[in-house]
Amino acid sequence: EKIKFEEKDLLKDNFDKKFDIIVTKDTFEHSLNLPNILNKFYDLLNDGGKAYIGFGPLYNSYNGDHGRTQLRLPWLHVILSEKIIIKRYNKKNSNKINRIEDLGLSKYSFKDYKKMFSESKFDIDYFITNQSDHPIGKAFNILSKINFLEEYFTFNIYCILRKIKI
């Protein structure tokens, strides 16, 4: 059978087929309605189907703003208030924003993601963080094991979610 690509809105469009596998890479940190997306994934998968998910950087990590706030220092987007960031951004740009989410960032924390995954209908078959070949990744992985630093030194998530067979 040939592969066919279609552009569809996951939450608005209807799908006439179910899937065995869903793959998503570097999108969840931009997705504003993740619980609904996870529910839709669940509905679209066949029993036993899997969602392979990888994404980052997470918002509270050193570059979690993806540079979109135009702040030059690591974690400054977490340190400064949203009000200050928006005011500074709007002063420098013709396309004005009212909230950080207008820059295409969900602002979900690592804690938020863990909660959304655990509260979803899925079984979590695999869950790992801070996957990188970069030397700083190893240091961040160590620092993320310290409880109060976990949120700020966890920069990506890779997981496999499985739809339970009924």
Which stretches of residues belong to each language-model region?
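Flexible, glycine-/basic-rich loop-and-beta segments that form/coincide
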Residues: 166
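S-adenosyl-L-methionine-dependent methyltransferase catalytic module, highlighting the catalytic core
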Residues: 35-36, 40, 50-162
